[in-house]
Amino acid sequence: MHCPFCSATDTKVIDSRLVADGHQVRRRRECTECHERFTTFEGAELVMPRVIKRDGTRQPFDEEKLRGGMLRAVEKRPVSIDEIEQALTKIKSTLRATGEREVNSEMIGNLMMEQLMSLDKVAYIRFASVYRAFEDVSQFGEAIAKLQK
C-alpha cells in the first residue's frame, strides 16, 4: 500500500485486529521511508442485489439511502451510531443471504422496520408513518397497537 504522506510504495503492518463484529480488519501501518503511521480498514466487497422499486424500475442498492432513512427515523432519539451501523449490517446481511440478484424495495422497508422496532419504538412509528403513507390517526393507532403486542 502506498503511503498517504510521501507516496512511498513500501509500508509495513504494525498491528492488525478484527473490528465490526469480525467483518473488517483494522491495520496500523508505518511507512518505511518517512516513518509516518496510518490506519487502514479492510473488508470483503460483497455484491448487493439490485432493488426493484414499486413502479417496477430497477436500481443499484444504495447503502447511503438506507442509512439516511434510518438516521431520519432515529433523529433526536437515544440511539447510538454503533446501534445504527449494526442494524444496517444486519439488513445488508439478510439481503445478501437471500441469494437473489434482485429484491423488492418492500422487503428492504420491512427489514428496516424490524430493525427500528428493536432499536426504538418512536423511530419505528416515524419510519412506518412515512413508509406506509399513514393518512389518518387510526393508522397510527394500529401501528402502536402492533408494538404493544
Swiss-Prot record:
PROSITE patterns: ATP_CONE (PS51161). Binds 1 zinc ion. Keywords: ATP-binding, DNA-binding, Metal-binding, Nucleotide-binding, Repressor, Transcription, Transcription regulation, Zinc, Zinc-finger. Residues 49-139 form the ATP-cone domain. InterPro entries: ATP-cone_dom, NrdR-like_N, RNR_NrdR-like. Its cofactor is Zn(2+). The keyword Repressor applies. One of its GO terms (biological process) is negative regulation of DNA-templated transcription. One of its GO terms (molecular function) is zinc ion binding. It comes from the Bacteria. A zinc finger (unnamed) spans 3-34. Belongs to the NrdR family. Negatively regulates transcription of bacterial ribonucleotide reductase nrd genes and operons by binding to NrdR-boxes. This is Transcriptional repressor NrdR. It comes from Shewanella frigidimarina (strain NCIMB 400). The gene is nrdR.
